């Protein structure tokens, strides 16, 4: 029976059109996170740097360097960037600190300000801007905090659950946050008061690695080898099964398409959510995928656990 299931999945993927990268960008270290704003790419790396690329020129135009750190043996090493974000002229950087702690920096006007220090021993897993004066960050212990930058204080916090934290995502308007963890459950909160609004569960039965939300559609990429789709408008949820862990995933701006890591060869599958139809197989990624991002409906950027970001144009196979 198991062989039949795997054969069926293999045949479905064969129906997807293979697409190789249109171009690639090489960074200063392994890519951990990236964002795009106004055709400018901001890339967090393992090499104590944020690399800044122009997508139009396809070249690096700047970089931000953060201080190196001492490891447990006293050796000087690069600080790994865990997450990066941007609002107006401010860039938010969450990075590895000494003794297992985390640093949060804000880069503005060519100056680097350390707003949360590794000495506080906070094991922060992810941080994003809520607005110009507030950030939202999550601890590995699955606590969510809203932090006032100007007054240097926490103004609200919640304990999501006793499960270890995996990932959070803000809605495009930043009015809600979705949080997921090792339980496979997704909780949605209002970012004004961190009041719980909804819970989505049942489609994943193990840790969810990443989540995304666009319009009324939620994508969950799971350790259970499932890509789960939930809807905030009451539509029936479903999941797609794969023969490998689904490490990363993203939704297109329209929420019509999803792209997820799909196999042990580091390929990514694009499928139509409304038709549950496999469309494209994005190939030539050389390591486990770390992030997928739709630049628009037809262009996708994919990073893996190496120094390259691949860019795919879906129009090529239309």
PLM regions and their residue ranges:
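Short loop/turn segments that connect beta-strands within beta-propeller blades
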Residues: 55-58, 107-111, 148-152, 190-194, ...
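Blade-level signature of beta-propeller repeat domains, shared across WD40, Kelch, NHL, RCC1
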Residues: 288-318
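Hydrophobic beta-strand positions that form the internal "hydrophobic ladder"
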Residues: 41, 91-92, 135-136, 177, ...
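Beta-strand-rich domains and repeat architectures in extracellular enzymes and scaffolds
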Residues: 23-50
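Hydrophobic core register within WD40 beta-propeller blades
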Residues: 34, 82-84, 127, 168, ...
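Residue-level detector of Asp-centered blade-edge/turn motifs that repeat once per structural unit
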Residues: 36-38, 86-88, 130-132, 172-173, ...
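Structural motif
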Residues: 49-53, 99-105, 143-146, 185-188, ...
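A short beta-strand motif characteristic of beta-propeller blades
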Residues: 20-26, 59-74, 111-118, 153-159, ...
